[in-house]
């Protein structure tokens, strides 16, 4: 009794402390559970400031043609959860920052209370599936998955029809940004939990046991034999997005023949490309553009829906009698001639060509995520939980690039066979469905013997670089993507052991030389003196798209480029005359990237102008070229290893370049420092970032092994960055190896409107207390011999007060230190006699470009 009373007394005395401790333990348990669900495969992904890790050696297997990698993080897309920085080394000082996370979803989402209306519909069994999916086997709600219309505001008052359990489903509901998407996810999960979504079994009609995987070898002797019977005709399905219209035209020019048909789907987000393709199609009777458009995201169910709808269109187009369906993207290119392809298919007119992953089906199912439930909405593929593969069939897959017979396409589109209907239902909720749907249907259909395990393509897989989970912002999975071909890969294009007629991927902004080599190999050289063979232009802004697609940084830069160019025209001979003075009118009408010999040459800005003297408005094109900024400083063997030192944004780890080619960045951007190295002795280098007022923003070490080619790191700097010229120094034992400068652009626009003084006061002031990191590195200023900051600090303070013309003058002056005017031309007649017509120059986007110009059909039915 005494002991019991003593215990009770202790409990009463410390009950508050005990309750607090229990609450903390409970909270920690919930946090651990939440992290395990959201970031199961990405430990350490905690927030914006992180300890860096070594470069990822790449994930995914070496299966031949599958894009799937492994299960990825389901991190936030629109909240504060970011992917980890890829790091080549370790910071000088470890920085830890607390991260404010959004409130996590509760463990369970309770169902909505049942309505009191007596006529409540009971969604169960097949009726439930039809209510959600629709009779055609696809989701209703218009074009669910293709994101029709503007997203609705987030509203957490959606009403699930069941109690939702499972970490994946709860994570998806917590991260979805619109009520519409949340409701769709809840509907799908409830049907799945009730067992009413997925088919339990699917009938198999193939008479062969096991997996069918025959192949065909390339035989030069047989290829030379004449074709018996009529030659086949091909329906090419071109699935394109982006803005690379010149590369698309070059592809079409290479594959075009008047006996074939070309059907082009342009992603709904690519309006500039759509306008260009519609204009192109008007000149050829056998080229058409889909009258409908979808948003086809990587790995999404919408891609399969697009293919099936396109196939139906092609079957029902009057006068289009074709024998084979071949899908291509704008990054493909032929490796053999049209004559060779037609002869080969004519000799194999009853075969379907699809590339399989191999023979390890269980591994493929896991790697591809076929045993997981996915749903597409808000341009994202959400992982919602696990599911079972239907019994009774062989599941196969591999590449989503294929060559299919018309009879098989008719079977897939028109049949009422339960095999196809139920597989459509299954693949509506599948990641990368186009990589498996046609394989699985064919291998279980009566036509299974027509399968050939070859899609007639060669793909440039480098999984060490291509499997870096670069699609985690689009899909809750880690996927892979092939690399672009370069001249050193040309031997891979010359396949001799198996028939290949196309290759991918090619990008002219990455390397155009390999296309020149391949084009010459197929069709011979262009006539001597043909212009622009080494030039490439790509539009990145068009007035018809409106300024909504431009960031404030780009809007600031493009308008400043126009002012700088017009000032140049007014002050530099031979243009420096009264009739060559112009004022810009409105925003630029277009902007192009310009490359020559696979090197970025700058921006081409087209601008409407008004002559200062009397006269009508004119349109000029201006060429702004970046200045070389790297300064090699060392003389040792280690210093000679440094090839380049760059700072930019939009780092592409697969191609190891900045997709922001001009390196334009503003105060709210998060720059990356990248170094390229030649082979040589191991070294450890220190990277130091210095802002315009000589504040040492950060410093960290990188380890460079003997065979390292590229190192890069994005330091987690506090924002906003101070505008002006920054310096990045590379040192070894505090002795200089190299140095570069980059510009943080002062913004003249904020939210597409002229910058106001109250916005400039914080946007251009740098981080609070000049603290870019939680730990100060200012102690390094003496070692680095930096000047005293007092004078530049006062100038920086005055800059925070600038708006209007004074702000534009500051912005123009900063840009002029990094960019120079390389050319100026007139699109039409000009009051300035010294201005050359753009079409007569070699650099203008309006200059001749024969390799990407289609022209009339020649006597042999071709364009090239």
Curated annotation (Swiss-Prot):
The UniProt entry, under InterPro entries, shows: Glyco_trans_14, XYLT, XylT_C
Residues exposed to the Cytoplasmic side? 1-15
Q: What is this protein called?
A: Xylosyltransferase 2
Q: Name one GO molecular function term.
A: manganese ion binding
Question: Where do the annotations place UDP-alpha-D-xylose binding?
Answer: 239, 267, 296-298, 400-401, 481, 504-505
Give the way it sits in the membrane.
Single-pass type II membrane protein
Q: How does it assemble?
A: Monomer.
Q: Where is this region: Disordered?
A: 39-123, 136-158
Its recorded reaction(s) are: UDP-alpha-D-xylose + L-seryl-[protein] = 3-O-(beta-D-xylosyl)-L-seryl-[protein] + UDP + H(+)
Q: Does the keyword Iron apply?
A: no
Which segments does the topology annotation call Lumenal?
37-864
Q: How is the cofactor bound?
A: Active with either Mg(2+) or Mn(2+), but activity is highest when both are present.
Per the annotation, which location comes first and is thus the protein's main one? Golgi
Q: Please list which residues make up the signal peptide.
A: none
Where, per UniProt, does this protein localize? Answer: Golgi apparatus membrane; Secreted
- In this protein, the residues bearing a glycan are 122, 327, 682
Q: Which cofactor does it need?
A: Mg(2+); Mn(2+)
Keywords on record: Disulfide bond, Glycoprotein, Glycosyltransferase, Golgi apparatus, Magnesium, Manganese, Membrane, Metal-binding, Secreted, Signal-anchor, Transferase, Transmembrane, Transmembrane helix
Bias kind Basic residues: ranges: 73-82
Residue intervals passing through the bilayer: 16-36
Q: Which pairs are disulfide-linked? A: 162-190, 206-448, 467-480, 469-478, 580-832, 825-838
State the function annotated in the UniProt record.
Catalyzes the first step in the biosynthesis of chondroitin sulfate, heparan sulfate and dermatan sulfate proteoglycans, such as DCN. Transfers D-xylose from UDP-D-xylose to specific serine residues of the core protein.
Q: Where is the composition biased (Basic and acidic residues)?
A: 53-65
Q: Its annotated pathway?
A: Glycan metabolism; chondroitin sulfate biosynthesis; Glycan metabolism; heparan sulfate biosynthesis
Q: How is it modified after translation?
A: Contains disulfide bonds.
């Amino acid at each position: 009794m005494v002991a019991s009373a003593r215990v009770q007394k202790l409990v009463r005395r410390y009950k508050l402390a005990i309750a607090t401790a229990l609450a903390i333990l409970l909270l920690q348990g919930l946090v651990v559970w939440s992290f395990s669900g959201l970031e199961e495969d990405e430990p350490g992904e905690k927030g914006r400031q992180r300890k860096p890790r070594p470069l990822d050696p790449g994930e995914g297997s070496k299966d031949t043609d599958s894009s799937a990698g492994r299960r990825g993080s389901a991190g936030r897309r629109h909240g504060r959860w970011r992917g980890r920085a890829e790091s080549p080394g370790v910071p000088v000082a470890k920085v830890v920052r607390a991260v404010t996370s959004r409130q996590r979803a509760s463990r369970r989402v309770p169902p909505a209370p049942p309505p009191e209306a007596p006529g409540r519909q009971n969604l169960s069994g097949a009726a439930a599936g039809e209510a959600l999916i629709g009779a055609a086997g696809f989701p209703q709600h218009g074009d669910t998955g293709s994101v029709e219309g503007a997203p609705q505001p987030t509203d957490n008052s959606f009403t699930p029809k069941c109690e939702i359990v499972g970490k994946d489903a709860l994570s998806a509901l917590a991260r979805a940004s619109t009520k519409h998407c949340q409701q769709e996810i809840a509907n799908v999960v409830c049907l799945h939990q009730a067992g009413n979504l997925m088919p339990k079994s699917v009938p198999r009609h193939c008479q062969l046991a096991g997996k069918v995987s025959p192949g065909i070898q390339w035989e030069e002797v047989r290829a030379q034999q004449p074709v018996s019977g009529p030659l086949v005709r091909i329906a090419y399905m071109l699935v394109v997005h982006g803005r690379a219209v010149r590369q698309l035209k070059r592809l079409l020019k290479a594959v075009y023949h008047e006996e074939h048909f070309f059907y082009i789907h342009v992603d709904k987000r690519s309006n500039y490309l759509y306008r260009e393709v519609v204009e192109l199609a008007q000149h050829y009777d056998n080229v058409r553009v889909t009258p409908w458009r979808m948003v086809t995201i990587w790995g999404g169910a919408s891609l399969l829906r697009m293919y099936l709808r396109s196939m139906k269109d092609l079957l029902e187009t009057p006068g289009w009698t074709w024998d084979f369906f071949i899908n291509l993207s704008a990054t493909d290119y032929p490796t053999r001639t049209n004559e060779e392809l037609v002869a080969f298919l004519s000799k194999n007119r009853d075969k379907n060509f699809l590339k399989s992953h191999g023979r390890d089906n269980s591994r493929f199912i896991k790697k591809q995520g076929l045993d997981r439930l996915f749903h597409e909405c808000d341009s994202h593929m959400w992982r919602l939980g696990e599911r079972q593969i239907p019994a009774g069939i062989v599941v196969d897959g591999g590449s989503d690039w294929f060559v299919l017979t018309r009879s098989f396409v008719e079977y897939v589109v028109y049949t009422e066979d339960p095999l196809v209907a139920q597989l459509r239902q299954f693949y509506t909720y599948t990641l990368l469905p186009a990589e498996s749907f046609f394989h699985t249907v064919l291998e279980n259909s009566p036509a299974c013997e027509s399968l050939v395990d070859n899609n007639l393509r060669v793909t440039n897989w480098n999984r060490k670089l291509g499997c870096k989970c670069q699609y985690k912002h689009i899909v809750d999975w880690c996927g892979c993507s092939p690399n672009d071909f370069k001249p050193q890969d040309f031997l891979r294009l010359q396949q001799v052991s198996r028939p290949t007629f196309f290759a991918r991927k090619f990008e002219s902004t990455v390397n155009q030389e390999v296309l020149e080599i391949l084009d010459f190999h197929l069709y011979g050289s262009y006539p001597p003196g043909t212009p622009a063979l080494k030039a490439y232009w790509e539009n990145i802004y068009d007035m018809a798209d409106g300024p909504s697609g431009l960031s404030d940084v780009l809007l600031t830069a493009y308008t400043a480029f126009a002012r700088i160019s017009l000032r140049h025209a007014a002050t530099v001979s031979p243009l420096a005359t009264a009739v060559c003075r112009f004022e810009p009118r409105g925003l630029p009408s277009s902007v192009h990237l310009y490359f020559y010999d696979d090197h970025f040459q700058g921006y081409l800005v087209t601008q409407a102008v008004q002559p200062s003297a009397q006269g009508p408005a004119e349109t000029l094109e201006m060429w702004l070229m970046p200045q070389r900024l790297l300064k090699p400083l060392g003389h040792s063997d280690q210093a000679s290893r440094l090839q380049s030192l760059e700072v930019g944004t939009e780092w592409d780890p697969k191609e190891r370049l900045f997709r922001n080619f001009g390196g334009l960045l503003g105060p709210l951007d998060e720059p990356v420092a990248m170094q390229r190295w030649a082979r040589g002795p191991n070294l450890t280098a220190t990277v130091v970032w210095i802002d315009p007022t000589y504040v040492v923003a950060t410093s960290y070490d990188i380890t460079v092994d003997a065979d390292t080619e590229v190192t890069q790191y994005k330091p987690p700097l506090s924002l906003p960055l101070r505008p002006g010229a920054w310096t990045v120094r590379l040192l070894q034992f505090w002795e200089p190896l190299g140095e570069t400068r980059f510009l943080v652009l002062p913004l003249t626009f904020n939210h597409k409107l002229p910058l106001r003084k109250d916005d400039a006061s914080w946007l251009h002031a740098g981080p609070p207390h000049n603290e870019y990191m939680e730990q100060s590195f200012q102690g390094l200023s003496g070692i680095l011999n930096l000047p005293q900051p007092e004078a530049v600090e006062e100038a920086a303070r005055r800059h925070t007060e600038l708006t209007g013309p004074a702000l534009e003058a500051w912005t123009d002056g900063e840009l002029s230190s990094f960019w120079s005017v390389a050319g100026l031309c007139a699109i039409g007649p000009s009051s300035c006699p010294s201005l050359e017509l753009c079409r007569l120059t070699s650099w203008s986007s309006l200059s001749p470009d024969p390799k990407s110009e289609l022209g009339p059909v020649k006597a042999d039915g071709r364009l090239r």
